[in-house]
């Protein structure tokens, strides 16, 4: 009911009388007053004037589902959202939901994470209320061999959303990080549950530093606030990310991975650099010369031979 009241206030042009809300929402004016008190306690600034009614003045900087879904206008991504004040990891929660059959497009987000993680078990620093920490459940009818394409697609969608909202152009460090200059802005973690040649579901985790200060991040990281020199509305950023993911996900499902590749190649932080790819099968060092049609990175070794890596931890050497 709180969500309905907020939506009612957002759509109103000016003040809304308690009587009108009572009739439209089919509840007593006393119940409406009670909900208003609860919403104020959550951080909503609601003005009440005798004989005029209620008016929403400001919303809190919180990733509430009803805030994210208001005017989201997606068909799949974000139609169901689980929001938490704090979680160990949104990835773990989303994976459990995936196992339970939760619909594709479901989002798990948290204001903060106590055990946020990146690739290879690394810690993802998640200062509370300063970033977007979320995991998305996808159920694409694709073979497991195409999963690297999902990671790159999410990277492109995230970069496009950031550019649209801030005019910043992030570069993509293959396969899963976004950078501004030499500093990391966002990371992507993809985990899948598959049987033989069939993907049951994928969980895509996103960590984006939005309003974090330098003192709250590692020396190698940055945030949108640091780069733009101003605080940003996390809900608006999150909405743009979800819209962008839906757009690029549908492109991928329709066989247009070439558009993802083109974007990655044009905005790569890795290509033309000397790199080392760490892999259990053995490290590979050389120049990153391309991204293959299946999303793998092409490395030209000093011998002149070219090897493709589909996964691995990559280090930029120069």
What does each model-found stretch correspond to?
Residues 2-163:
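N-terminal lobe of the biotin/lipoate ligase/transferase fold
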Residues 177:
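Conserved active-site carboxylates
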